[in-house]
């Protein structure tokens, strides 16, 4: 209704004004003004609107200009807030806006306050944000709205008055009169009458509205602009979070916190459950809340107390008299009092004019009087503190003391002297919270940070500062009453009450009353060496308002005769940093020097000028002769700055004086002056002052370099809160207050004090000040000391860091790093994160001359992920326990010489070498040094003196027995214990030793426990950092970790867990865990099943079913992280033509499709090309984008895996018309064409040198091109062409494929383009581009660091993911090859493997040349020598027969080809082909050993005749037969067997035997896993029974007897002597064969777990796919020695010598036909070679490159007639029994079998019986071979690793015998191709090559007696066709045998056999 009246009045006024423009008179205006409503007494503050009051705006004479001004004012007023007149800038439109509940604002306003807002209103249609939030706040808001309406109407009336006045003046001037003016006057009267009625109705509705409005508007002129968030006229602001503390604002704010708080009207809308009491209850209703009678309290007040309070309420301060909340006006304050504190105030009319006023109740008067008394007491105490400080106290300090005392006095009506009544409030959760956060709550009591001694006036600033240290504190929790508020608004409202109980004080008061153990203050002072006087301030600080009986003190009440509470110690760091830089030019102070310098440059730039090179300071006038001192003076601004000690408020001129002051006064522990100064800073006797207690003495503090406290003492002690609390006083007046301890804590403090009474005080801080050992100058850290010494004492620098290579010492590790890089050539990228060095203990002695008793060196450059992480590499950044090491990882001394009690639990001793370390980090990193040389168990079994200098890491300082209390530390050269075990294991039981070994394993294995990002290969030491990396760098959210079920280890993905399970828990990794995939060998597409792969080959590649099935059988199982097939090289042409040849396919698809854009190499699969490109430096390491889809990847491996899987392209070959290269598709061809600058050549060019092959090529229309790679050269191609020519001449078969190592086609080399080349002298690789060659050389230079032991320790590589590096570990701790997908467990294995990628044959060029020359010179004179040289050449070319072999084959039948041979020898290249091809799959290998192992492991079921290892005699239960030990439990037994398996040698190639069940496994890792599995078996069942062994022995004996009979009857005339000899040998062989003990063949399936599937990468061993001989390097030193093939020296691990039965036969052979000199020579060569093999552990880790190269290197100087290096010589990397015939080189004195038996006679088997049987049978086989030199044993023609080790050698011998008999006649008629090793002839080159491979696989098992028996059987087969037919069924169908060529070779072979038998 009021709105309607207002609208009517407004309309009427507008019409009147429009009608009276020309006739209005002044009298009307005056009368209208007089008739205004009676609201003119209200004054309006228009500051916020930018105008003045309406009264001041009424002119006596107005002009048109003034009218326009009033119109603008009106416009401005109409745009203000409709409800509160807030300025327009803070308003929004009412019409088009909505409230939070989606209700239109106009409706909201009408419903809430009854004001209807319409678009037609003349009043404002704007509303401010504050009013929107207030709409539903409180009922009195309507009053304000009504007042605003009246105010706006008044403005309208004022405007009308001004207008009427203006019109009146005009009418007076114009003489106008009359009627209209009277009419307007009547209208005005009517309008005023309506408004009077409206006001009357409003007053009836709200009788107090008028007075309220008056109160609201009263005092508006006194408005002040404040920073507080008051309501009017400033806008309301949102509640902000706690600000970030800048730590430089030290200006103390007002004690009143209202400046930082918001208007409580924001929080009035509360529910009952949100508060402690009903809303109607008073906040100070003591009867309701605290049980205190307010009336009794008020009665005790002075009579004038209430009057004083009432008078205070009438003061000009607009604040609430109950909660001190300030408001902009007194009216708002009174309204707040009535609404929020209705029970504390009452309306009274006792005013002079009988106006109702609000008066406080007596209860409130009592509370206010308490506060006033407390304030008076605080002021008095502050004055006393100022007097105690001698008047030297700043205003800031004075205010701090006053505030502390006031807070202590604000008891809120709680009786803390009797805390028992509040015990129910202390729930268990609250007590636990107080105990956990004791340190923080203690600081919260005084709002003072303990670290920086900084006081904060408000809760918000204090919490913003301390949350840095206590980030886990909950939000919205009151730390007094521990009430958790639902919202921040409620929390702030709760804080402003300031009347909640302090539970921390209650708990401490209760503890103080129950404490029985009390530490007297006198004892503490005596312990500290301080005087017994008590500071004045401390003594009186706790006495607060003692004259007022109603005041409850919250501080410590101390009797006049008592002492203060013992202050808490202040750490040295806290004292040193507790300073302020004050400017002498202005009163400002700054916390840091940087801020001060910035201030000077900004504000006083004219004063502080730059150095003018004058000796005199331009400001202070001091003279500085030394330019260094002058510049330091200028830079430090010494003449402008003044340092203030914030601990005691002392001012010092220089920083040095400040340091002296802190050391002397605060850390020295003597002098009362410092005590009083300190006491004056903290006030109120709280435990923040100074404390000399536990203060280290100055001398010990200035002790030397890095000696300090343990990390746990130098860091926060929040983990043990009772220890941080201080003991109570000795008196009985111990009252509440922050710091009492429990009985146990007090007792601990007492014992600590007693211990520290005699101990120097250097153990409380780890970063103690340092002193120059030359001049005694003090500095606060070691680096500053070094900086001083470098400038002042450059010739006396300490040699703290010593080089491990040359022993030079340097004071800084950075100098050592530069030395290592510049002098020793260490790659600087390898040492960015870690460095290995020896710390010179002599350089870090203490300043007083004493030597620290534990390791005191600095280890600054240790990566964090090398910390002692114990949960699988996923430990979070927070330390595990309170005593964990500091994050800086400075291994400082944790004690000094006499503090033995504290250091006993902190010393960490190395169990291997007894080096002592101060914490786990030093020990963990030191343990890694032991693990580098060998694994953990070998390190434990090795003595300390076995460590070579290369494995040194940290040298511990020796200590005497008296210092350590233990036996002292052992240096690296200390002798081992007699038992050859570490000292820590000397007195342990076997069970303890087993546990100890396992702990060593786990400790050393920590280097594997790091997480690696599988996308970018970065490593992380914690899950937190890994998650952050994945989120920020790869946008991967919700990273999940796979947790081990057996321990707390977690892994990023499954592979890490698999490896962890295998390595740590010994869990077998099953085949079903490996995803089986089938890869197309043509295009590398992977399929999930074999049928899909075959269908793909048939449809896409047009392969027949036979070829498809053949190729499908070669598909490998590919792991997700390793897409490489085992054994495939990556830098050569790997064409898989064997499958095409097997199927007889003549498909026209080209051989090479993928062309490298950096070199001429090309490949047949995309995968191979991608791997090859990754080896190029030209490959842009920063460009990892897919050219097909545009995806960008983090590394090249990720990119090529993506292309390999996602973009398998269909071949569309395109040939370059210039260079004839064939590309995979047109795009690659188009990319190549612009860069091709070669002349066009045609298929009829100069390269067509072989007519037959060329014709065959054109007939087949095969588009085959061969381009040069690092392994090819022109000479090789010439050699291959000659081979093809000779082959064509010999058999006419020009279409044969697969001749050379499986990657060259029939005529592929005929089209090769000759380009000028340059060869690498290191690896032999050849290049046509000089730039490529230069970058290749750089690779070798970067490989140099591999030989550095530092690199072997730290595997952190260059930061660039694409940068070349070798030792990059993956997440499982394995080293990944950067050229392929293989991983290795040790860096030495990776080193060997990488050489395999870049290997070349240039080292063997001289050997080849000499070998060729020797062959040419001696070919016509000694056929035996020819044979041996052909053995060498055969080895040199791998398995590919060359022209020498062809000529030798011809010479076996005719002597016409000698000249031909010589010419072909002269044209032989100095470089030899190295690729060997598997005949069962498409894999190619670079060494025979790799091929041999491949056959053993992948094709064991495809090869029928494998040499079998001996049957293992199983150990009895809980008994070790080898060691003759018995065990109590199965666990100890298995543990012992595991330890033994790590060092045991294999029984035969790739055959590690299990003594528990007799099973053989192909790898040592599998053996250990197998033994581990026995632990889970209840009963261990052997793989073969005795009955099976006896049956097998009987069968083999019968077969041998039959062979012997056939041999005796089939001897010819020309071999009588041989027949007699063979008869004797055969008889001996038959006798010994009866003793054979081999299990049945039906057991062959027992070990299927060792099939090819186990060779996959995901098996967890990490090296199963290693193609070189280093797969077992990780197994330790012991095995490496065994792998060297050192049997020649008679070293036998089991101590079993060769059987005695062999001697008669050997002697018999020697008497018959042995050249003793030759035999001695052979034996001598073998022994010398074995000596070379035993050179050392490091040499044993070389690659199989050395296997082949070193053989020739050693044999190079030998004459023709001497014995060439035997089979195993030079095989330093091979397992001891892994030998191959093709690796052997002989000069003809001894065939390869003799060398084999030489090797293995001396390496006897563990079991004497087994060894005898094995040797006998092998001798039988060998005898057959040697008695008939022209027949070869094919016993292991295509062998692979057979898990069944049950087929005996006699069985193999039967096969080979039958084979020879079958083919004897055929080979007489057709010489064909002859084997140089055994003179056996074959029809084709393919068969010969397959046969030669059998020599590789057949050799290792031969021994002396078996060789003799084999020779006899072979002699029998020469003439016994019937016997051959009987055994032909056992021979391989496609193996075609031949007969002997001549008698000369037969006799020579017999001699050799005899020689071998004698040995």
From Swiss-Prot:
InterPro entries: Matrin/U1-like-C_Znf_C2H2 (IPR003604), Znf_AD (IPR012934), Znf_C2H2_sf (IPR036236), Znf_C2H2_type (IPR013087)
Compositional bias ranges of the Low complexity kind: 716-727, 741-759, 1445-1467, 1697-1715, 1833-1851, 1942-1952
GO biological process: behavioral response to ethanol; negative regulation of adenylate cyclase-activating G protein-coupled receptor signaling pathway; regulation of transcription by RNA polymerase II; response to ethanol; response to heat; response to oxidative stress
PTM annotation (Phosphoserine): residues: 228, 680, 832, 894-895, 898-899
One Pfam family, short name: zf-AD
Knockout mutant characteristics: Flies exhibit defective responses to environmental stressors, such as heat and the free-radical-generating agent paraquat.
Other facts noted in the record for this chain: Stress, at both the cellular and systemic levels, contributes to drug- and addiction-related behaviors in mammals. Function of hang suggests that this role may be conserved across evolution.
Name of protein: Zinc finger protein hangover
Organism: Drosophila melanogaster
């Amino acid at each position: 209704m009021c709105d309607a009246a207002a609208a009517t009045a407004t309309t009427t006024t507008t019409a009147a004004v429009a009608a009276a423009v020309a006739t209005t008179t002044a009298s009307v205006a005056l009368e209208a003004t007089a008739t205004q409503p009676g609201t003119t007494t209200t004054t309006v503050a228009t500051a916020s609107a930018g105008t003045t009051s309406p009264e001041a705006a009424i002119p006596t004479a107005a002009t048109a200009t003034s009218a326009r001004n009033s119109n603008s004012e009106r416009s401005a007023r109409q745009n203000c807030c409709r409800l509160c007149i807030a300025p327009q800038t803070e308003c929004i439109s009412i019409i088009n806006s909505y409230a939070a509940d989606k209700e239109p604002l106009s409706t909201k306003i009408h419903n809430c306050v009854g004001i209807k807002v319409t678009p037609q209103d003349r009043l404002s249609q704007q509303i401010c944000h504050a009013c929107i939030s207030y709409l539903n706040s409180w009922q009195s808001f309507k009053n304000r709205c009504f007042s605003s309406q009246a105010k706006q109407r008044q403005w309208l009336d004022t405007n009308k008055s001004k207008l009427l006045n203006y019109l009146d003046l005009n009418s007076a001037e114009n003489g106008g009169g009359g009627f209209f003016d009277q009419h307007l006057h009547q209208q005005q009267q009517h309008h005023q009458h309506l408004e009077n009625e409206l006001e009357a109705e409003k007053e009836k509705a709200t009788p107090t509205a008028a007075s309220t409005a008056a109160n609201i508007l009263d005092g508006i002129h006194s408005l002040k602009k404040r920073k507080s968030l008051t309501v009017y006229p400033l806008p309301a602001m949102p509640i902000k979070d706690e600000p970030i503390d800048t730590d430089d604002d030290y200006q103390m704010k007002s004690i009143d916190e209202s400046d930082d708080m918001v208007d409580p009207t924001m929080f009035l809308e509360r529910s009952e459950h949100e508060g402690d009491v009903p809303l109607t209850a008073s906040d100070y209703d003591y009867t309701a809340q605290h049980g205190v009678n307010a009336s009794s309290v008020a009665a005790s007040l002075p009579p004038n107390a209430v009057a004083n309070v009432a008078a205070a309420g009438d003061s000009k301060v607009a604040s609430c008299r109950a909660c001190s909340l300030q408001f902009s006006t007194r009216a708002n304050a009174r309204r707040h009092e009535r609404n929020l504190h209705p029970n504390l105030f009452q309306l009274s009319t006792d005013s002079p004019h009988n106006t109702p006023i609000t008066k406080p109740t007596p209860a409130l008067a009592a509370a206010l009087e308490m506060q006033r008394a407390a304030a008076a007491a605080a002021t008095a105490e502050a004055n006393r503190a100022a007097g105690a400080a001698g008047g030297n106290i700043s205003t800031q300090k004075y205010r701090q003391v006053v505030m502390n005392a006031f807070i202590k006095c604000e008891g809120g009506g709680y009786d803390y002297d009797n805390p028992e009544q509040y015990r129910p409030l202390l729930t268990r959760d609250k007590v636990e919270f107080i105990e956990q956060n004791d340190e923080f709550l203690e600081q919260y009591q005084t709002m003072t940070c303990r670290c920086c001694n900084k006081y904060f006036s408000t809760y918000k600033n204090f919490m913003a500062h301390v949350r840095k240290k206590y980030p886990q504190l909950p939000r919205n929790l009151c730390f007094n009453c521990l009430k958790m508020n639902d919202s921040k608004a409620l929390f702030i409202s709760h804080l402003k009450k300031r009347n909640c109980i302090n539970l921390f004080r209650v708990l401490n008061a209760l503890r103080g009353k129950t404490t029985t153990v009390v530490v007297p203050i006198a004892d503490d002072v005596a312990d500290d060496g301080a005087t017994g006087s008590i500071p004045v301030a401390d003594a009186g600080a706790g006495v607060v308002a003692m004259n007022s009986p109603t005041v409850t003190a919250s501080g410590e009440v101390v009797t006049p005769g008592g002492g203060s509470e013992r202050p808490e110690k202040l750490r040295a760091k806290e004292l040193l940093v507790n300073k302020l830089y004050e400017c002498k030019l202005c009163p400002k102070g700054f916390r840091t020097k940087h801020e001060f310098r910035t201030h000077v440059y900004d504000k006083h730039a004219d004063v502080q000028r730059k150095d003018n090179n004058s000796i005199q300071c331009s400001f202070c006038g001091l003279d500085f002769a030394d330019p260094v001192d002058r510049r330091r003076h200028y830079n430090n601004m010494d003449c402008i700055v003044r340092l203030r000690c914030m601990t005691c408020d002392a001012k010092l001129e220089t920083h040095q004086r400040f340091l002296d002051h802190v050391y002397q006064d605060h850390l020295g522990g003597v002098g009362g002056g410092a005590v009083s100064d300190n006491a004056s800073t903290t006030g109120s006797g709280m435990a923040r002052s100074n404390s000399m207690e536990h203060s280290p003495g100055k001398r010990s503090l200035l002790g030397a370099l890095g000696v300090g406290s343990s990390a746990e003492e130098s860091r926060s002690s929040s983990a043990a809160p009772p220890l941080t609390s201080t003991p109570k006083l000795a008196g009985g007046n111990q009252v509440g207050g922050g710091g009492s301890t429990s009985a146990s804590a007090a007792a601990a403090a007492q014992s600590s004090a007693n211990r520290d009474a005699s101990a120097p005080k250097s153990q409380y801080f780890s970063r103690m000040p340092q002193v120059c050992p030359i001049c005694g100058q003090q500095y606060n850290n070691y680096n500053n000391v070094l900086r001083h010494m470098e400038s002042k004492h450059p010739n006396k620098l300490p040699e703290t860091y010593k080089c491990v290579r040359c022993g030079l010492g340097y004071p800084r590790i950075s100098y050592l790093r530069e030395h290592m890089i510049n002098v020793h050539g260490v790659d600087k990228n390898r040492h960015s994160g870690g460095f290995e060095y020896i710390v010179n203990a002599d350089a870090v002695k203490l300043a007083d001359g004493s030597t620290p008793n534990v390791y005191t060196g600095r280890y600054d450059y240790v990566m964090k992920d090398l910390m002692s992480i114990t949960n699988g590499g996923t430990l979070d950044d927070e330390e595990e326990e309170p005593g964990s090491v500091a994050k800086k990882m400075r291994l400082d001394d944790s004690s000094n010489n006499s503090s033995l009690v504290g250091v006993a639990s902190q010393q960490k001793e190395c169990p291997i070498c007894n080096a002592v370390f101060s914490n786990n980090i030093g020990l963990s990193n030191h343990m890694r040094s032991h693990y580098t040389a060998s694994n953990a168990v070998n390190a434990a079994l090795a003595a300390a003196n076995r460590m070579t200098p290369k494995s040194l890491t940290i040298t511990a300082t020796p200590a005497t027995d008296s210092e350590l209390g233990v036996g002292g530390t052992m240096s690296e050269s200390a002798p081992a214990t007699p038992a050859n075990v570490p000292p820590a294991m000397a007195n342990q039981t076997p069970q303890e030793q087993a546990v100890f070994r396992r702990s060593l394993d786990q400790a050393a294995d920590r280097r594997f426990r790091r997480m690696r990002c599988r996308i970018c290969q970065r490593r992380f030491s914690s899950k937190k950092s890994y998650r952050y990396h994945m989120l920020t760098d790869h946008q991967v959210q919700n990273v999940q970790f796979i947790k081990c079920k057996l321990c707390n280890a977690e892994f990023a993905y499954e592979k890490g867990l698999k490896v962890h399970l295998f390595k740590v828990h010994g869990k077998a990794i099953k085949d079903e865990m490996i995803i089986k995939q089938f890869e197309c060998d043509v295009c590398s597409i992977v399929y999930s099943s074999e049928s899909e792969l075959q269908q793909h080959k048939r449809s896409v590649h047009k392969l027949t079913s036979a070829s498809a099935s053949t190729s499908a059988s070669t598909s490998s199982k590919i792991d997700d992280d390793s897409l490489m097939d085992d054994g495939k090289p990556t830098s050569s042409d790997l064409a898989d033509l064997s499958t095409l040849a097997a199927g007889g396919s003549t498909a026209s698809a080209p051989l090479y499709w993928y062309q490298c854009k950096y070199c001429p190499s090309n490949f047949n699969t995309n995968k191979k090309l991608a791997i090859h490109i990754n080896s190029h430096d030209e490959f842009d390491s920063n460009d990892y984008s897919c050219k097909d889809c545009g995806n960008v990847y983090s590394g090249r491996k990720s990119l090529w895996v993506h292309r390999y899987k996602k973009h398998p392209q269909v071949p569309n070959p395109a040939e370059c018309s210039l260079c004839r290269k064939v590309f995979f598709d047109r795009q690659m061809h188009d990319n190549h064409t612009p860069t091709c600058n070669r002349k066009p050549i045609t298929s009829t060019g100069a390269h067509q040198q072989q007519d037959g092959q060329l014709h065959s090529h054109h007939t087949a229309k095969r588009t085959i091109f061969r381009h040069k790679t690092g392994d090819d050269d022109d000479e090789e191609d010439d050699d291959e062409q000659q081979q093809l020519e000779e082959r064509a001449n010999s058999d006419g078969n020009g279409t044969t494929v697969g001749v050379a190592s499986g990657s060259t086609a029939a005529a592929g080399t005929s089209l090769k383009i000759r380009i000028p080349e340059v060869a690498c002298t290191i690896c032999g690789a050849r290049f046509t581009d000089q730039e490529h060659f230069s970058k290749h050389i750089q690779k070798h230079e970067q490989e140099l660091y591999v030989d550095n032991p530092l690199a072997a320790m730290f595997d952190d590589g260059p930061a660039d993911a694409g940068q070349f590096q070798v030792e990059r570990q993956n997440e499982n701790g394995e080293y990944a090859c950067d050229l392929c997908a293989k991983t290795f467990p040790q860096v030495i294995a990776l080193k060997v493997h990488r050489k395999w990628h870049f290997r070349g044959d240039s080292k063997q060029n001289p050997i080849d040349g000499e070998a060729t020359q020797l062959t040419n010179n001696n070919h016509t004179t000694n056929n035996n020598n020819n044979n041996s040289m052909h053995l060498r050449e055969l080895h040199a070319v791998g398995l590919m027969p060359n022209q020498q072999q062809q000529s030798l084959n011809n010479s076996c039948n005719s002597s016409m080809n000698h000249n031909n041979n010589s010419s072909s020898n002269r044209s032989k290249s100095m470089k030899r082909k190295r690729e060997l091809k598997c005949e069962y799959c498409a894999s190619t290998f670079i060494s025979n050993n790799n091929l041999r192992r491949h056959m053993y492991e992948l094709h064991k079921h495809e090869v029928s005749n494998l040499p079998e290892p001996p049957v293992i005699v199983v150990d009895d239960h809980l008994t070790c037969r080898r060691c003759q030990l018995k065990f109590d439990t199965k666990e100890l037994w298995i543990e012992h067997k595991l330890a033994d398996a790590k060092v045991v040698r294999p029984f035969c190639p790739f055959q590690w035997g299990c003594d528990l069940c007799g099973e053989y496994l192909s790898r040592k890792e599998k053996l250990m896993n197998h033994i581990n599995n026995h632990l889970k078996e209840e009963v261990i069942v052997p793989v073969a029974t005795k009955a099976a062994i006896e049956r097998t022995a009987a069968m083999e004996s019968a077969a041998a007897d039959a062979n012997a009979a056939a041999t005796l009857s089939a001897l010819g005339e020309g071999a009588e002597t041989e027949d007699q000899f063979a008869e004797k040998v055969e008889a001996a062989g038959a006798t010994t064969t009866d003793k054979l003990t081999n299990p049945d063949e039906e057991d062959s399936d027992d070990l299927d777990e060792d099939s090819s599937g186990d060779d996959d990468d995901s098996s967890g061993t990490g090296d199963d796919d290693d193609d070189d001989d280093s797969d077992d390097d990780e197994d330790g030193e012991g095995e490496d020695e065994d792998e060297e093939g050192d049997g020649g020296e008679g070293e036998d691990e089991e101590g079993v010598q060769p059987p005695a039965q062999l001697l008669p036969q050997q002697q018999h052979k020697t008497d018959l036909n042995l050249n003793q000199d030759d035999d001695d020579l052979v034996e001598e060569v073998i022994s010398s070679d074995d000596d070379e093999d035993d050179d050392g552990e490091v040499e044993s880790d070389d690659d199989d490159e050395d296997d082949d190269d070193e053989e020739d290197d050693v044999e190079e100087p030998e004459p023709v007639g001497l014995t060439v290096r035997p089979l195993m010589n030079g095989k330093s990397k091979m397992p001891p029994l892994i030998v191959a015939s093709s690796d052997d080189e002989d000069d003809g004195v001894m065939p390869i079998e003799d060398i084999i038996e030489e090797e293995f006679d001396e390496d006897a088997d563990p079991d004497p019986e087994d060894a005898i049987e094995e040797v006998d049978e092998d001798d039988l086989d060998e005898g057959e071979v040697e008695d008939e030199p022209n027949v070869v044993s094919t016993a292991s023609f295509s062998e692979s690793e057979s898990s069944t080790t049950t087929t005996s050698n006699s069985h193999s011998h039967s096969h080979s015998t039958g084979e020879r008999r079958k083919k004897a006649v055929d080979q007489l008629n057709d010489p064909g191709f002859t084997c140089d090793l055994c003179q056996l002839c074959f029809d084709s080159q393919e068969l010969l090559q397959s046969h030669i491979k059998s020599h590789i696989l057949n050799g290792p098992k031969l021994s002396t007696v078996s060789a003799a028996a084999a020779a006899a059987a072979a002699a029998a087969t020469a003439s016994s066709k019937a016997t051959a037919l009987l055994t032909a069924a056992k021979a391989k169908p496609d193996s075609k045998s031949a007969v002997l060529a001549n008698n000369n070779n037969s006799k020579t072979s017999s001699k050799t056999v005899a020689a071998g038998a004698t040995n």
